[in-house]
């Protein structure tokens, strides 16, 4: 039987096409904005960007006419409806429905209008709740998902499978990357619904500004987590667009584990909070360990460059200039 998984597809031409038209969907988000910065830094001059008000990705007819008119050569799909546990529990229909609509519209129109290559970005939440650690790509669909974000996860799994199906049926070069926990400029620092790293940064900053004696953090601080600076992810995306044309999705992680306690101490140091750090052990810890196995990407020749300490310092500078100063 012939190999129709597309593993024989040519790679290495993306970096040579600096004037090719590239559509980055979701360019205002944490991930999309970093990809745009990286592409511009690398000398790409023909980026097509649309805000939500200019192009509603959930509208099939709008997406279809956009592709018919603009005819991008490459597509990076970083647009998604995202949110924390509370949002996922409150709006499950939105999390599965909106993400399925965006993916279906963009992937199908990209294929029908002759896009040369598409990169779909997912999330580490696609993996089973009790996946082996570190989590290899092969763990996908081997067990039940974490119930708190299964609606979002199922949509993302469908996106991976859609790319694979179009590759199998149409020999079309659609690839998928699965990032670990991300942080960096343009992150969400909202007090109610931000992730652990920006939430800690905001709390330490506010405690410092208010001369507070202590900051109380939920749990014991023992869970292990992995963090990747979003600029490293953007670098990996450009690398994958240029160097990877395989059937299987690719994990994109830092490979470095840190306890929540170590993370909190590091953020405290970067922010310059001199008070005490108190752990409320009556509160839950969450999953004890979550680490992606990114050895496949490393074997292709890509590794991250930004250390957690440097990344946190950059992120705090951005937070001061773009969140704190704008409130004043």
Curated annotation (Swiss-Prot):
Domain of life the protein comes from: Eukaryota
Keyword NADP: yes
Positions with a binding annotation for substrate: 203, 218, 225, 285
Record-annotated site: Lowers pKa of active site Tyr: 156
Important for catalytic activity (site feature) positions: 123, 125
Signal peptide positions on this chain: none
GO-annotated molecular function: GDP-L-fucose synthase activity; isomerase activity
Record bears the keyword Oxidoreductase: yes
Record pathway: Nucleotide-sugar biosynthesis; GDP-L-fucose biosynthesis via de novo pathway; GDP-L-fucose from GDP-alpha-D-mannose: step 2/2
Amino acids binding NADP(+): 26-32, 156, 179-182, 195
Residues with N-acetylalanine modification: 2
Record InterPro entries: Epimerase_deHydtase, GDP_fucose/colitose_synth, NAD(P)-bd_dom_sf
Family named by the database record: Belongs to the NAD(P)-dependent epimerase/dehydratase family. Fucose synthase subfamily.
PANTHER family with a match to the protein in the record: GDP-L-FUCOSE SYNTHASE (PTHR43238), GDP-L-FUCOSE SYNTHASE 2-RELATED (PTHR43238:SF8)
Subunit structure: Homodimer.
Name the UniProt record assigns to this protein: Putative GDP-L-fucose synthase 2
Protein encoded by which gene: GER2
């Amino acid at each position: 039987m012939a190999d129709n998984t597309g593993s024989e597809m040519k790679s290495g031409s993306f970096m040579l096409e600096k004037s090719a038209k590239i559509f980055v969907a979701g360019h205002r988000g944490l991930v999309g904005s970093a990809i745009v910065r990286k592409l511009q830094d690398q000398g790409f001059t023909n980026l097509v960007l649309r805000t939500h008000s200019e192009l509603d990705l959930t509208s099939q007819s709008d997406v279809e006419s956009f592709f018919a008119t603009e005819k991008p050569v490459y597509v990076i799909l970083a647009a998604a409806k995202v949110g924390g546990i509370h949002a996922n529990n409150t709006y499950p229909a939105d999390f599965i429905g909106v993400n399925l609509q965006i993916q279906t519209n963009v992937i199908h129109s990209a294929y029908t209008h002759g896009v040369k290559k598409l990169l779909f970005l997912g999330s580490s939440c696609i993996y089973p709740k009790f996946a082996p650690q570190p989590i290899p790509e092969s763990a996908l669909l081997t067990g039940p998902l974490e119930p708190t974000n299964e609606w979002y996860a199922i949509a993302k799994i469908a996106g991976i499978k859609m790319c694979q199906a179009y590759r199998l049926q149409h020999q079309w070069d659609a690839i998928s990357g699965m990032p670990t926990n991300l942080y960096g400029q343009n992150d969400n620092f909202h007090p109610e619904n931000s992730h652990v790293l920006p939430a800690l940064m905001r709390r330490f900053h506010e405690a410092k500004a208010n001369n507070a004696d202590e900051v109380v953090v939920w749990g014991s601080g023992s869970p292990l987590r992995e963090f990747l600076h979003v600029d490293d992810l953007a670098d990996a995306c450009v690398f994958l667009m240029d160097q990877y044309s395989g059937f299987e999705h690719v994990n994109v992680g830092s490979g470095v584990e840190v306890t929540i306690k170590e993370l909190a101490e590091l953020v405290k140091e970067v922010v310059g909070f001199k008070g005490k750090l108190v752990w409320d052990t009556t509160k839950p810890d969450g999953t004890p360990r979550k680490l992606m196995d990114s050895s496949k990407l490393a074997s292709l020749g890509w590794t991250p460059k930004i250390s957690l300490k440097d990344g946190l310092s950059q992120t705090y500078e951005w937070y001061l200039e773009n969140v704190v100063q704008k409130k004043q």
